[in-house]
Amino acid sequence: VNLLFNLVKQTSSALKETDYDIEIAETHHKHKKDAPSGTALSLGDYAALGRKTSLNKSKILDRTKKLSSRKKGEIGFSVTRGGEIAGEHTVSFIGENDRVDLVHKANNRSIFVKGALDAALFLSKKKSGFYTMNDLLFNK
């Protein structure tokens, strides 16, 4: 997922706001309570960063409350809950003539355990300090 964050920011920066709308769709198991998920909101943050704005200014969580056409710069969210899906996130950049989708699908929850263990191993070899998942991904 951390790689996806970086890809979303880069893609958002590269594709013009006037030419591409951004939609974030996420699916999780039926037991998940928050909607949208923290991961989906983080993806929105990275998309907004790529456009040099804030998610608070651009997020649309519910299109059912007022009837209006889409405004430039909006970042829309859609949420699905069902079954035992560990997590699926799609960030779509939708233009007039094409669509670019960036997708991450967790087949099961073990991928999150692996990420935590990889991070712990990485940190065990480092001096005390502040590190992010980007340090793990890009500075091995």
Language model features: what each stretch is:
Residues V1-D21:
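A contiguous active-site-proximal alpha/beta segment in oxidoreductase catalytic domains
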